[in-house]
Amino acid sequence: MIRLATLQVLITSILLSSNNHPIILVHGFLGWGKEEVGDKNYWGGENDIEKYLNDRGYQVYSVSLGPVSSTYDCAIETFYQIKGGQVDYGQEHSEKYKIIRKPEGKIYKGLYPEWDEENPVHLIGYSFGGLTNRMLLHLLNSTFLKSKDGEFEESYLLGNSLRGWIKSITTMSTPHNGSTLSDIVIKSLPFTDNLPVSYTHLTLPTIYSV
């Protein structure tokens, strides 16, 4: 769980040095969203950092992702929770890992439906959340094929290059070079061995690591 003072300093620094674009908080491994663990807030513990900052004029949102999902799945879910719409993991990925491409329970109104190149966001990720954000940047900047015949994915995210949608990425205690904890988890939870966990090194937009 993240302390209020630490995150407030980070957010203030981002806004003072850049602009007033919305800030999206992305939790890490075994994390949770608002009101999912009783009165305990992932961002603040006994305090609600998101509410505290919004009450003071900041535009801050937080996403709720699968606690042991892959970077790819978390990035896809982050996109649709921010933009809104039906989560679409893509045809090729869904067939390869035998998952439901468009889960019925994952349709979102959107935390910030205006999100696009003209209305970018800042992403703050704690621990594994930093890798999720970097994967999202990779997906936004790329286009993907659903088959060998050259057809693009039908997914809005995967079938289009959406460059410039992220103003900055700030990572906190993120294992950019991997973590031995993943080996322990995979041995304890065998099903996670089939989850694709990867990320790519990107230099744009601005990436901060603290």
Label the model's feature ranges.
Residues L15-S17:
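Sec/Tat signal peptide C-region and signal peptidase I cleavage site
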Residues L4-S13:
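Sec-dependent N-terminal signal peptides
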Residues N20-V121:
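Active-site catalytic motif of lipid deacylating hydrolases and related acyltransferases
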Residues K34-E35, T71, R134, T180, ...:
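Active-site-proximal flexible loops/turns
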Residues L204-V210:
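Single conserved hydrophobic/aromatic residue that forms the stacking wall/gate
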Residues G31-W32, V68, L131, N177, ...:
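Active-site loop signature of alpha/beta-hydrolase-fold enzymes
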Residues F79, Y89, S94-L202:
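Serine-dependent carboxylesterase/thioesterase catalytic core
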